[in-house]
Amino acid sequence: MQKIDSETEKKFLEAENYRAKKDFRKAIEIFESILEKFPDLPPALHNIAICYTELNKIEEAEKSYLKCLNIEPVSLLSINNLAKLYYNKGQFKKALPILQKSLLKKNDQEIVVEITAQCLFELNLPKDTDLFCRQALKNFPQNKNLKTFHGKNLLRLNKHSEGLKYLNESTGMIEFGENNFKIT
């Protein structure tokens, strides 16, 4: 990463303050002035992307994240935020490979695992969803969202009793039997 001078560091902090105050346009303006001097500064690009996301300027946010990742491809924060951008817009097909890249870098991100399972489910990839959820539940056996996606997916695969088992575990449904009932 580039070393910045103290004047640029002050400008960066000023831009961060504007971003914290939700004055995203002013923050973008200052971050862009920093990029004039340091055109390949990933933190400035990343923060611009965050500001554009908050302003609902998705294409601009995407461009900033992609440029940031082109400079610093290992930035897990930028990878996850780009995936989140696509996910929040329902662009599951675009989000999925980025989420998978994130999990290759760090596989214990429970939220990223959940979102990956949801993307697979929403893309109607039942076999991939089944394999992914089975593996993910080994790592996160108490995760109710994973159990829900796995249960719904098993119903899609016509594995009704197994699917209902996972859905019951995730929702805490009451099961009634002929002679007794139990709360799970």
Where are these regions (language model features)?
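Canonical positions in the second alpha-helix
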Residues: 33-34, 67-68, 101-102, 135-136, ...
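Structural marker of alpha-solenoid helical repeat scaffolds
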Residues: 3, 37, 71, 105, ...
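Register position in tetratricopeptide repeats
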Residues: 20-21, 54, 88-89, 122, ...
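Start-of-helix register in tetratricopeptide repeats
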Residues: 9, 43, 77, 111, ...
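Alpha-helical segment of the N-proximal tetratricopeptide repeat
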Residues: 6-37, 43, 50-54
